[in-house]
Amino acid sequence: MSRRSTTKKKLALPDPIYNSRLVNMLTVRILKEGKKHLAQRIIYNAFDIIKQRTGEDAILVFESAIKKVTPLVEVKARRIGGSTYQVPMEVRAFRGTNLALRWITKYARERAGKSMSMKLANEIMDAANETGSSIRKREEIHRMAEANKAFAHYRF
């Protein structure tokens, strides 16, 4: 076993405009080739689009979208006696948020459209309205966990 002490998790710093850790975590997911300012501009433009379309505060729409996309359970492969079982496990809060952000950015990139900020805004609004690809992904994960409920006693 390693003698070195475990590192403490670094908390994401809040972003400069909305003072939200979630927005900063999203910035890191959007980031490409170290261009953080561009990633922030994409997010802030997306939030402006959300505010114009919904008339609500964009950060509240974003937070509700994250809550709705966050999975509660997932399946992990566990090898027992030569066969591999998909064992349903509860998702911790931080991992759930991370997965939600990852799915929202992934499906926003895959959308057809002109600008990334428009695609991101549409994906966030769809997630807040419980439609869209990221919500479908969450439901698919939950369905897999439900189907493999019989192997729940193999939890580790």
From Swiss-Prot:
Subcellular location: Plastid, Chloroplast
Primary site of residence: plastid
MF-aspect GO terms: rRNA binding; structural constituent of ribosome
Gene3D superfamilies assigned to the protein according to its UniProt record, in alphabetical order: Ribosomal protein S7 domain
Highest taxon of the lineage: Eukaryota
A single cellular component GO annotation: small ribosomal subunit
SUPFAM superfamilies for the chain: Ribosomal protein S7 (SSF47973)
InterPro entries per record: Ribosomal_uS7, Ribosomal_uS7_bac/org-type, Ribosomal_uS7_CS, Ribosomal_uS7_dom, Ribosomal_uS7_dom_sf
Keywords assigned by UniProt, alphabetized: Chloroplast, Plastid, Ribonucleoprotein, Ribosomal protein, RNA-binding, rRNA-binding
Gene Ontology biological-process entries: translation
SUBUNIT field: Part of the 30S ribosomal subunit.
Family in the record: Belongs to the universal ribosomal protein uS7 family.
Function as written in the Swiss-Prot or TrEMBL entry: One of the primary rRNA binding proteins, it binds directly to 16S rRNA where it nucleates assembly of the head domain of the 30S subunit.
Protein name (Swiss-Prot/TrEMBL): Small ribosomal subunit protein uS7c
Species annotation: Guillardia theta
Gene name, Swiss-Prot/TrEMBL: rps7
